[in-house]
Amino acid sequence: MITLLDQETPDDIAAALAQRVRMRRKEQKLTQAQLSSKAGVSLGSLKRFEHDHQISLQSLIKLSIALGCESDFSELFSKKGYYSIQEVLDER
């Protein structure tokens, strides 16, 4: 299983996201054309994302909605970042 935490660079993270989108698309037995139509994203954008890992945030969100993964975005940046052990202890 690919986790984003295992990745080291922005390019690695983008590649992992593109791979996940491709896998989810194939699990749902959708062609690139079908997913692009369902998401309202150009076919070229989807192909570029799956091949070159380049996509706008807006298009990525549209693909996520079309694939039923939009709730994953609610988790993004939702956890509080701690800068010291004392901050963790103070919350208890």
Regions picked out by a protein language model, each given a short descriptive name:
Residues 2-27, 76:
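A short, Lys/Arg-rich alpha-helix, primarily the initiator
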Residues 52-65:
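Short, basic-rich loop-to-helix N-cap that marks the start of a DNA-contacting helix
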